[in-house]
């Protein structure tokens, strides 16, 4: 097979790492959704790997590090960059385009500046620069406040994040109207002059998975009862604010709420209780 060379940037955002590409740098056939694009990202990350190690790729054998991002200048009014996220399976030939990665969202602004997707003349010499991001997977607006020092993205700092060993600069994120479904993606609020937002520290089909957006409580209930075959019934709150999330009482699952990841993933019974399937 002929060799191709594709520029890419490897970045950490929050507690995740991923490989970032400029859309224009991908081969022409991969600049559109489809099998060619997915195949390139799978190979870049080292998937599918039956050994589960991703030795021959940029993935690092965990869901937190088997991620890909495609960035491009935005043609959408009021936005600087379009951000498309793909969760790359480790052992299967599959890229999930159905949602966003909140962690890597913190790296999109700095990466867009590094990649020249934002005019250099707009970047201040010092201070903070707001990068307006269109999150294409879920159709929402994110504003990343990127620290700038001497005209460059400031990467070092004293911000500490649980799960990350070393301190770094903080990139504050604003998720604009994360629970509302509308064509403006949160760029325009129902309250004039006062956009609704949720703040967070840095730390399918594409490009728009319609099922990922909607009301704050998608079922219309504050509390639902989930029936897990062979496990039992659990009281749960289903919330859709940026990414669909299920909240459960730790004690009902046999936890205290202080367990580390290993204590949960080692238990097959508990993993079955956590796993859900949609029709």
Name every feature range the model reports, one short phrase each.
Residues 21-22, 108-110, 247-250:
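Short hydrophobic alpha-helical segments that form membrane-spanning helices or hydrophobic packing faces
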Residues 242, 266:
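Glycine-rich ThDP/TPP pyrophosphate-binding loop and its adjacent helix/strand module
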Residues 258-260, 277:
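C-terminal catalytic subdomain
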Residues 269-278:
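Conserved small/polar residues in nucleotide/adenosyl-binding loops
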Residues 48-129, 137:
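Anion-binding (especially nucleotide phosphate/pyrophosphate-binding) glycine-rich loop
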Residues 123-236:
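Glycine-rich, mobile lid/loop segments that gate access to catalytic sites or pores
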Residues 1-75, 148-156, 204-208, 223-225, ...:
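Generic N-terminal targeting/processing segments that precede catalytic cores or assembly contacts
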Residues 174, 245-252:
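Glycine-rich phosphate-binding loop plus the immediately following alpha-helix
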């Amino acid at each position: 097979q002929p060799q191709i060379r594709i520029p890419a940037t490897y970045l950490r955002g929050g507690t995740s790492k991923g490989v970032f590409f400029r859309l224009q740098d991908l081969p022409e056939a991969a600049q559109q959704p489809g099998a060619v694009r997915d195949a390139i990202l799978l190979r870049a990350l080292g998937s599918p790997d039956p050994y589960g190690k991703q030795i021959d790729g940029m993935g690092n054998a965990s869901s937190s590090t088997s991620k890909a991002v495609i960035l491009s200048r935005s043609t959408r009014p009021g936005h600087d960059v379009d951000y498309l996220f793909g969760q790359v399976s480790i052992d299967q030939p599959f890229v999930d385009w159905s949602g966003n990665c909140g962690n890597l969202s913190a790296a999109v602004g700095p990466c867009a500046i590094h990649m020249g997707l934002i005019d250099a003349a707009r970047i201040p010499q010092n201070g903070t620069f707001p990068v307006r991001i269109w999150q294409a997977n879920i159709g929402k607006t994110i504003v990343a406040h990127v620290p700038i020092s001497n005209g460059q993205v400031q990467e070092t700092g004293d911000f500490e994040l649980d799960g990350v060993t070393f301190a770094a600069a903080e990139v504050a994120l604003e998720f604009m109207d994360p629970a509302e479904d509308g064509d403006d993606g949160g760029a325009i609020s129902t309250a004039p002059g006062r956009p609704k937002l949720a703040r967070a520290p840095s730390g399918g089909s594409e490009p728009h998975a319609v099922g990922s957006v909607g009301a704050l409580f998608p079922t219309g209930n504050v509390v639902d009862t989930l029936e897990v075959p062979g496990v039992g019934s659990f009281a749960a709150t289903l919330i859709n604010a940026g990414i669909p999330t299920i909240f459960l009482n730790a004690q009902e699952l046999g936890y205290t709420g202080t367990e580390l990841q290993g204590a949960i993933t080692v238990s097959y019974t508990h993993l079955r209780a956590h796993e859900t399937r949609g029709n």
